[in-house]
A protein has these predicted regions:
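An acidic-aromatic substrate-binding cleft motif
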Residues: 307-359, 363-366
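Aromatic/acidic polysaccharide-binding cleft in carbohydrate-active enzymes
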Residues: 590-649
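Carbohydrate-binding surface patches
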Residues: 680-730
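Substrate-binding/active-site clefts of carbohydrate-active enzymes
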Residues: 339-342, 373-395, 400, 405-495, ...
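Aromatic-rich carbohydrate-binding modules that target alpha-glucans
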Residues: 114-169, 179-194, 249-264
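C-terminal beta-strand-rich structural cap/linker in extracellular carbohydrate-active enzymes
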Residues: 745-763
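Active-site-proximal helices and loops of the catalytic beta/alpha 8
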Residues: 495, 502-503, 507-589, 607, ...
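Solvent-exposed segments in extracellular or luminal domains encompassing
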Residues: 75-93, 168, 264-278
Length: 763
């Protein structure tokens, strides 16, 4: 089936890519508008504009954009339009038809009002002056233009460089880059006041009919929560403005049935007779108010159960169509930079990693994430030259599969680093593309010369003077997802390795279209973990796509705490910011203090702060991640692991954190509270700004994975200071389960006290 996937949601000014699934490169495809909002320039019968191809350029700059086509053709040399880009110009519902080799498919896009607001980013001229000369040009670099240098330019205004932008509310990190030199960039934050995104959860009940002649009804209720207030910039949402939109999946019912079901929604409730439902139907609930949020989806299936007689009682079962694998709900992840893991003498091979699996088991690791293992001319492996062959210096595919088997024997899952946003420019496909071979003409995106800062005299081709790339990454050109041939080949790559490994970490996930990730999520085996590298983390990558996300909010906060720029209590703010962004599930975050792209926390902030930061990652919900060497005292971010001269006490500290997390279900899936007992923690001796406390309590809905929702809450106290802190804790805190602090002592009328070195976990 070439159906284009679920209904899509976006807002005015935020383009969405639409594409057939399981594409046939030799098939013929075409898109036609069936319906559009009254205020849109699109009309029924319209087709993609042949003079506007590919995703639209950055829409962040104010006053510089020219009128854009609402429906753009794909960036290919084909006569048909397999992939199109909708750049909505009005709120409402757009309905499109995809004519494909297997028939006609319906695609709806629900568009909410424009969320962008105007702001000026200003940087003093003196901050960007190098060698006593002013730059000729200054580029704005940030996620809102997909980190493309030279796409948005700042203008000189007196003694400042100014970029006028239009972006959603929030704090947006940016760089002003002089003359394409990112090493000389000035970084800062653009503050755009406004509300966060709402969050939604669904509750379902079957309401029995009073009249036996009538059908029982399915009642879906959307609980919509407004965003919390983080500060004066990232303010809370208006609860009175909240609502939910219910969208029935067009793949599961004909348009008439879809309209009949959706018409029975009233506010946040959808009540439908069971007789009106197909045997299996997916329903998406989208929260919206001042802004819109990520949808939650349920699949409603007929469930014929036998009663005490022989009659079948009509009922339904509700199924999560993209559940997180049970093993991946809260695993301890260990990232290995593959070419440095064996130490400073032996070359790292799959065999050498396999010989050290016992160490991973000893440490308490649940999942091993390996940086790329495929053929590549680089040490880091992110410039892939062959998607089907392992790197020769690491070993054969058989040796890799032997490593996977050894991990499985130890109860450890293996996560594969999937690099499909780009290839190496040494990949044969790019070389053939550059040489003008027709079959590869559409395999890579192209840009005009003004967007290229590499200084390379690229081979001239139709479609653009230079290959498209992010930052100054001229060695890794971006693949073109408008090409059905590219999509087909990369889906084949996913299939190839999904049969071998247990999960994928998606490199530069933010560069690959959402529609493709939705297809991958539906395609891989049900027990496959999907982890996205999206910076900053974005809740829409959890909308039928990824199970776990980089927690960039906590990562940045732990760095700021380590540097003394924020107090330890900013951990609470980091979690609130995740909710403000629109994340509903704390457990869907990978918590980390460093990785292969970042400086070592130990080298930057010291051993005491590292131990505290690591303790935070292990005592919050989510998936704690150790970057190999973090636990051994490594100070170089990609250097060899310190085996013979490593810090064994630091290693044991991490091992005990993993063991305690495994032993205490509340540390894995309990709720987090900063009020209650946590608010009663008081620093008696030590630096109060370096201490934070929070409580892990039984989940509000359902039991813990240990099967006991009545377990006593756990009080976590973390100290980032180099010296121990003595804290007064509320009565009832009897024992330090971690054992890093001294025994809890009674202190007369003052309650109880505990000395906290790095962390205490009290019951």
């Amino acid at each position: 089936m070439h159906e284009p996937g679920p209904p899509r949601t976006t807002s005015v000014g935020e383009p969405v890519e639409l594409a057939p699934r399981s594409p046939d490169p030799d098939g013929t495809y075409g898109w036609t508008v069936r319906d559009a909002p009254a205020d849109s320039d699109l009309s029924p019968g319209d087709r993609p504009d042949p003079d506007a191809t590919g995703p639209p350029s950055s829409a962040t700059a104010v006053g510089s954009e020219t009128p854009t086509a609402v429906l753009r053709a794909g960036e290919t040399s084909r006569d048909d339009d397999p992939v199109v880009h909708l750049d909505p110009d009005a709120p409402g519902t757009y309905v499109l038809a995809l004519d494909a080799p297997d028939g006609t498919h319906r695609q709806r896009v629900r568009v909410f009002p424009d969320e962008r607001r105007e702001a000026d980013i200003r940087v003093p001229v003196d901050d960007l002056a190098g060698n006593e000369t002013d730059p000729d040009r200054v580029s704005l670099l940030w996620p809102h233009n997909e980190n493309r240098l030279a796409l948005d330019r700042a203008e000189r205004d007196g003694d400042e460089w100014v970029a006028s932008v239009r972006v959603p509310p929030g704090r947006h990190g940016f760089g002003f880059v002089p003359d394409g030199d990112r090493s000389a960039a000035v970084h800062g934050e653009c503050e755009v006041p406004g509300p966060g995104r709402p969050r939604v959860s669904l509750d379902a009940t079957v309401v029995e009919a009073d009249d036996p002649e009538e059908s029982d009804r399915l009642r879906l209720t959307a609980a919509v929560d407004s965003a919390p207030a983080v500060d004066d910039v990232e303010r809370g949402g208006d609860p009175d403005a909240l609502d939910a939109a219910f969208l029935v999946d067009d793949r599961d019912a004909d348009p008439e049935a879809v309209a009949a079901i959706e018409s029975q929604a009233e506010g946040r409730t959808l009540s439908v007779p069971l007789d009106d439902l197909p045997d299996s139907v997916r329903i998406h609930a989208v929260p919206h108010g001042e802004r819109y949020g990520a949808a939650e989806t349920v699949r409603v299936e007929a469930d014929e159960t036998e009663t005490d007689g022989s009659e079948a009682a009509a009922s339904v079962a509700l199924v999560d169509p993209n559940p997180t694998p049970e093993w991946a709900e809260s695993p301890t992840i260990y990232e290995v930079f593959v070419r440095s893991f064996a130490g400073d003498t032996l070359p790292t091979t799959f065999r050498e990693v396999e010989r050290r699996v016992e160490y991973l088991d000893h440490l308490g690791v649940d999942a091993l994430w390996l940086t790329p293992v495929l053929a590549s001319p680089t040490d880091h492996g992110y410039h892939v030259t062959d998607y089907y062959d392992t790197a020769a210096d690491l070993g054969s595919r058989e040796a890799f599969e032997s490593l996977v088997d050894a991990c499985h024997d130890a109860g450890i899952r293996v996560v594969f680093d999937l690099v499909i946003n780009h290839t190496s420019r040494d990949h044969p496909a790019f070389q053939l593309h550059s040489a003008g071979v027709d079959a590869y003409a559409d395999h890579y995106r192209r840009s005009d010369a003004t967007a290229d800062v590499t200084g390379i005299d690229w081979a001239e081709l139709d479609g653009g003077a230079a290959p498209d790339h992010y930052f100054e990454w001229g060695r890794i050109p971006n693949l073109n997802y408008d090409s059905p041939a590219v999509r087909e080949r990369l889906l084949d790559v996913v299939d190839e390795w999904a049969a071998v490994v247990d999960g994928f970490r998606a490199d530069v996930a933010w560069g690959v279209p959402h529609g493709f990730w939705k297809e991958v999520a539906d395609r891989v085996p049900a027990d496959t973990l999907l982890l996205d590298e999206t910076l900053p983390h974005d809740p829409f990558y959890g909308e039928g796509e990824f199970d776990v996300h980089y927690d960039t909010s906590l990562y940045e906060t732990l760095r700021s705490i380590g540097a003394g720029e924020e107090p330890a209590e900013a951990v609470e703010t980091a979690l609130a910011r995740g909710e403000w962004l629109g994340f509903d599930d704390h457990g869907a975050q990978m918590r980390y203090v460093e990785n292969h792209d970042e400086d070592r926390y130990l080298a930057e902030y010291g051993r005491a702060a590292l131990r505290a930061a690591a303790a935070v990652t292990f005592t919050l919900p989510g998936a704690p991640m150790i970057y190999a060497g973090q636990e051994r005292g490594n100070e170089t971010y990609r250097g060899p692991i310190r085996w013979h001269d490593g810090d064994n006490k630091l290693t044991d500290f991490h091992r005990r954190l993993a063991a305690l997390r495994e032993a205490e279900p509340l540390l894995r899936d309990g709720d987090v509270r900063f009020d209650g007992r946590a608010s009663g923690v008081r620093v008696v001796e030590g630096d109060a700004d370096r201490v934070t406390a929070y409580e892990r309590t039984p989940p509000a809905a359902g039991a813990t994975d240990g099967g006991d929702a009545d377990r006593d809450p756990l009080l976590v106290v973390v100290n980032f200071a180099a010296e121990p802190a003595t804290v007064a804790v509320p009565d009832g805190a009897e024992a330090d389960l971690f054992g890093d602090g001294n025994a809890v002592e009674r202190d007369g009328e003052e309650g109880r006290r505990v000395a906290v070195d790095a962390v205490a976990v009290l019951r």
